[in-house]
């Protein structure tokens, strides 16, 4: 519980929130993945929250240059990231299509 400000907030918050843990895990996953180009930028970041939720962006480059192989490798990495969401007590929201 937060107090009247007499103590440093950083010392009061002992537990990391699940979204922070997921972002850190995902960043480490990308950094250590053998298909990800470690010489280029990679990041996991939150975008601006909307009424539909809080978007999380995965930004990374692969070593692979051939398009079909690149698409398959990218999909495998993203599928693993999506599958891990529930392990952190989070969920993916998809806005339904209206006719």
How does the language model describe each region?
Residues 1-99:
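Structured, soluble regulatory/oligomerization domains located on the cytosolic or IMS-facing side
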């Amino acid at each position: 519980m937060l107090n009247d400000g007499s103590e440093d907030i950083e010392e009061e918050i002992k537990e990391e929130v699940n979204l922070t843990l997921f972002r850190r895990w995902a960043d480490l996953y990308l950094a250590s993945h053998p298909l990800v180009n470690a010489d280029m930028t990679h990041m996991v970041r939150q975008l601006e929250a909307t009424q539909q939720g809080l978007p999380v962006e995965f930004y990374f480059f692969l070593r692979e240059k051939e398009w079909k192989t690149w698409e398959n490798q990218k999909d495998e990495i993203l599928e693993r990231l999506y599958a891990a969401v529930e392990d952190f007590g989070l969920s993916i929201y998809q806005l339904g299509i209206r006719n």
